Amino acid sequence: MTYFVIFLGICFMLGVLAVASNPSPYYGVVGLVVASVMGCGWLVSLGVSFVSLALFLVYLGGMLVVFVYSVSLAADPYPEAWGDWRVVGYGLGFVLVVWMGVVLGGLVDFWKVGVVTVDGGGVSFARLDFSGVAVFYSCGVGLFLVAGWGLLLALFVVLELVRGLSRGAIRAV
């Protein structure tokens, strides 16, 4: 199980690398999906399945909408791929920064550190996050409505900010 969690962490970092060095929004979507799937799989292996599901829905529901608007508003005639030298340089720079953080942080011996998973704590720790579901839907209703309204308002503000001189992003169909 520890090797699986380390595999998920490495794949998560590769997804973050793909998002950080995205040459165009077309390829950034792929990195975002990989990072969100691996990160949520990591959370499931740690025993927080409801939070993982909520984050997965937020990432794929919210962030992919942002990437769709980015792709539609910034349509490149010749999008750069991950094989271009500039993008490879961004990726290598990101890997260098992460590696220096690992070396300077003293985390080089990460295989000697135990990972607390569902197997380590038993079945009683598998559903600790379900106790927060009642709080989400009882005390948090007002906050969810305010947050949803704020996100909708932010979407329209961004669409108005990026509109052109003659035709905006919000137009009659």
Swiss-Prot record:
GO terms for biological process: mitochondrial electron transport, NADH to ubiquinone; mitochondrial respiratory chain complex I assembly. It comes from the Eukaryota. It catalyses: a ubiquinone + NADH + 5 H(+)(in) = a ubiquinol + NAD(+) + 4 H(+)(out). It holds the Pfam family Oxidored_q3. Its main location: mitochondrion. One of its GO terms (molecular function) is NADH dehydrogenase (ubiquinone) activity. It is found in: Mitochondrion inner membrane. It is an enzyme of class 7 (translocase). Core subunit of respiratory chain NADH dehydrogenase (Complex I) which is composed of 45 different subunits. This is NADH-ubiquinone oxidoreductase chain 6. It comes from Gallus gallus.
